[in-house]
């Protein structure tokens, strides 16, 4: 537990940005719309989360499932290695911006994947990570 230092948050965001872009590219290449639809119940669970911590856990599940769908056997392990820190940051974001906003961000990402629009998925990911990196004071001590 406890707050993460700014340099730790920045490093985590940079690493997640790279991992996530690889993951999204592989997911788009290897999965059809029917496979991607399997993410819908996880998205619904994010929308229906009762609090920030619950939403953060469900967002982790969403990204972990994407990592599994990527077909890269290391990506789920890497995501899991950052589980505690990732959930901490998502929870902070939720407490600040609300569950609805976090859900909308993940829904937008899901929509780009369903449309096989990898460029938009990657651009969204870079933009979200950049916003977080520019707000390190909020996320890190």
Protein language model regions, located:
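All-alpha effector-binding/dimerization core of bacterial HTH-type transcriptional repressors
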Residues: 1-65, 104-127
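Short alpha-helical scaffolding segments that buttress acidic/His motifs in well-ordered protein cores
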Residues: 23, 78-79
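Residue-level marker of positions within ordered structural domains that often coincide
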Residues: 28, 71, 84
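Secondary-structure boundary/capping residues
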Residues: 32, 36, 75-76, 91, ...
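C-terminal all-alpha effector/ligand-binding and dimerization domain
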Residues: 43, 81-141
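Amphipathic alpha-helical packing segments from all-alpha helical-bundle domains
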Residues: 54-58, 73, 77, 96-100
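Short loop-to-helix capping motifs
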Residues: 71-73, 116-117
